[in-house]
Curated annotation (Swiss-Prot):
Catalyzes the synthesis of 5,6-dihydrouridine (D), a modified base found in the D-loop of most tRNAs, via the reduction of the C5-C6 double bond in target uridines. Specifically modifies U20 and U20a in tRNAs. Its EC number is 1.3.1.-, 1.3.1.91. It comes from the Bacteria. This is tRNA-dihydrouridine(20/20a) synthase. The gene is dusA. NCBIfam families: PRK11815.1, yjbN. PANTHER family: FMN-LINKED OXIDOREDUCTASES SUPERFAMILY PROTEIN. Belongs to the Dus family. DusA subfamily.
Length: 339
């Protein structure tokens, strides 16, 4: 990977407590290995998460669901599952592959996830979540964290949330939580609607941190700018950004300076695109389609003159036979002509 900038504040070894001050959320169909490689060029310090991977896929699947590039560090694996033994097996495999953190999904509300008995529905069984976390902690030395909501269905009282955290941190020995500041409806709403309709309740998450000061807690949900992130950091240990980081990845260019205190200059988006070329050429040689990679880059120039032309040209040409980095280079000229 071509290094765009060096971060003077970067610790000698990965510290997810430190990198977790700002992270990009696990997003199904979005934060795959190509996306994470690209985002890493924008910020050296941001903690990146995989898409959720089920224990069944890792244990029984034919593909390599743990594949990633070394350049992605710090990188966390999000697991979906509810069988403590299977989760422990997958956690051991992930640690052996070099992942920096294991995260258990206790927040996804989709019907498909619920049918697999994992995701947000697990919030209703705090003891099982504790058993899952403890099983993983017993076999790995890297952090095991939980991403969850502030409640589910009618179980949305603050007391319910505190009981959940108490059980999982006590019996499960979980020390790090990522709290999506919405509750989840397990029926009646789609996953997209569950990200938008239940109201955000940031004060409740702030209160949770005050009531559990010994735990490391990050906040997630509806965060759209670094200014908002910095405001949350007045109350929380970390901030996790989801859709905004994907749809407008350029915001990551200033994260190292604004969130982590780096003295380096922000990553230049044009330089980031060209730094992707060696990676893209290697992937193309392995049979990867250009469109599978550049789909994550479409929003890079959001708010910059030429952004629309950039998106349109890539969308219309990346799928063509023989498409290679020349497609990106031509698209860059459309942006450069507007700058």
């Amino acid at each position: 990977m071509q290094k765009i900038n060096q971060t003077s504040a970067m610790p000698e070894k990965t510290d997810v407590h430190w990198s977790g001050r700002f992270s990009v959320a696990p997003m199904l169909d979005w934060t795959d290995r190509h996306c994470r490689y690209f985002l890493r060029l924008l910020s050296r310090n941001t903690l990146l998460y995989t898409e959720m991977v089920t224990t069944g896929a890792i244990i029984h699947g034919k593909g390599d669901y743990l594949a990633y590039s070394e350049e992605e560090h710090p990188v966390a694996l999000q697991l979906g599952g509810s069988d403590p033994a299977a989760l422990a097996q997958c956690a051991k495999l992930a640690e052996a592959r070099g992942y920096d953190e294991i995260n258990l999904n206790v927040g996804c509300p989709s019907d498909r996830v619920q049918n697999g008995m994992f995701g947000a529905c697990l919030m209703g069984n705090a003891q099982l979540v504790a058993d899952c976390v403890k099983a993983m902690r017993d076999v790995v030395s890297i952090p095991v964290t939980v991403k969850t909501r502030i409640g589910i269905d009618d179980q949305d009282s603050y007391e319910f949330l505190c009981d959940f955290i108490n059980t999982v941190s006590g019996k499960g020995e979980c020390e790090m939580f990522i709290i999506h500041a919405r509750k989840a409806w397990l029926s009646g709403l789609s996953p997209k609607e569950n990200r938008e309709i239940p109201p955000l309740d940031y004060p409740r998450v702030y209160q949770l941190k005050r009531d559990f000061p010994h735990l490391t807690m990050s906040i997630n949900g509806g965060i759209k700018s670094l200014e908002e992130a910095k405001a949350h950091l007045q109350h929380m240990d970390g901030v996790m950004v989801g859709r905004e980081a994907y749809q407008n990845p350029g915001i990551l260019a200033a994260v190292d300076r604004e969130i982590f205190g780096s003295s380096d200059t922000d990553a230049d988006p044009v330089a980031v695109v060209r730094a992707m070329y060696p990676y893209i050429e290697h992937e193309l040689s392995q049979g990867t389609y250009l469109g599978h990679i550049i789909r994550h880059m479409l929003g890079l120039f959001q708010g910059i003159p030429g952004a629309r032309q950039w998106r349109r040209y890539l969308s219309e040409n990346a799928h063509k036979a023989g498409a290679d980095i020349n497609v990106l280079e031509h698209a860059l000229k459309l942006v450069a002509d507007k700058r």
